[in-house]
Amino acid sequence: MKKFLMVMLSVVLALTTFVGCSNGGGGNTPAPSENTDNLSEVQKIIAEAETMTLEELAKKAIEESNGKTFYGVGNSSRGKSALPLFIEYLQSIDSSYKLDFEWQQPKNNKIFDQLTADGLKDVGTFAMTLIQDGNQIESKMVQTGVLDTFIPKEWAEANGTTPEAYEGYLPLQTLNKIFEYNCVNPDKTYDNCWDFVAEGEHGLFMDIDSEIVGKNFLYMLTKDEYAAYLKDAYDKLSAEEQAYFQPTVDAMAKDATELGLGENGKYALAWIKLWVNSYNAVTDDGPICNTLVDASAVDKFGLLVYSKVRSVEETDTVSVNNIKVAAYQPGYEGIGGYAYCHYLFVTDNSPLPWTACAFIAYMTETVDGFSAWGKDLGGYSSNPIVAKETEEKFHHSQGLSAKVACETTMDKGYDWWVGDGKLVVEDPKYCASVAFTVGSWIEMLDKYTPE
């Protein structure tokens, strides 16, 4: 084990040096002031586009794509809902504008293969993408030159920066997956994140090999900030509860040292091991939600995307009132779940780069552009102005965007979740840096198999 880890650490040191050459994980597009001799044609357009307003970009898009077909691909199907609104916006500028479109949503993490194959063409099929999983984006898409980052000027200004100064990918939104539990049995509660990995618990969760952002969540737990969350929550357990977990924590100390983790790394590895050993894999978050809200799901819990509670259909046995959000309960200790982003990129061989830039700006700079996602709770625009106006329009904090307004559906918002809610927030660069070490360690863990 030790020899294996030393080899993997050497690999990671080399890769980290390579990854660190990018502008904070921000893709291949330099600031407009830099030398553009070595830029692709799309990168040159992006550099110019980053100096323009949405209206200016819209006029470029109309000129470029009128009468053509726009192809997009994404992890979210809602790009298909956003495109007609974008077209209506362009038609408000030029009523003669027409655009056909097709939006694809590959399953089973095939989006990376699809974009890689399309990237081999001189001119690609896909104009842009909406994509998740920061680790694979960094290693497979950005460092390989398949995707380019475009930072809209007015989005940057809303965030108090400029396209030139901003470092990182462009997030459309942050989504949260949170711990929820069936509360039909009033004697069964979860008041500490270690309760979810206690003896006999089997949380419902999308398998980490089918939805990789779940694996990134486990990577992130080893980062000092989040390992400290787990240690602090552990300290709040009773002596009896600690006695159950302590042997696992102690057993992880050596591995934590060999993996180069911080002082609380053994607590992170212990939680990860117990979680992987116990979670009950489910194919999608929808079935998890449907299970938990049924009165028959006594003493069950899950880690699932928050937005699913919006659409629960009330019956005699099914109700959103049958579940509680763990982090919302008084006295709850530890992590409330995890957060990841949907990122927007222009393909480096985009057939319609101006239109792609305009569409990206529209989604990140306007409430209407974000509304395909913003109409539901649990998804937070990366533009603070759009986020504020989205809340004013849909009233997520009052539960009014769900079928039933109650404590569970009253979204406390992004700031609360990343603060008091202690969400574990995905960091693409950190995930990439530990994917070969912590990732290989996780691969060797035994998964739970229901009898």
Question: How would you label these PLM feature ranges?
Answer:
Residues P32, Q43-L54, E64-P84, H342:
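Extracytoplasmic "Venus flytrap"
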Residues F18-A31:
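Bacterial lipoprotein signal-peptidase II cleavage site
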Residues M1-F4:
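Positively charged n-region of N-terminal signal peptides that target proteins for export
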Residues K68-E88, F101-Q114, G124-P287, E313:
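Extracytoplasmic ligand-binding site segments that recognize negatively charged/polar headgroups
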Residues Y267, N277-N349:
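Extracytoplasmic/periplasmic substrate-binding proteins
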Residues H342-G419:
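Mature extracytoplasmic/periplasmic domains
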Residues E41-E50, E55, C406-E451:
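Conserved C-terminal helix/tail region of periplasmic/extracytoplasmic solute-binding proteins
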Residues L13-T17:
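Hydrophobic core
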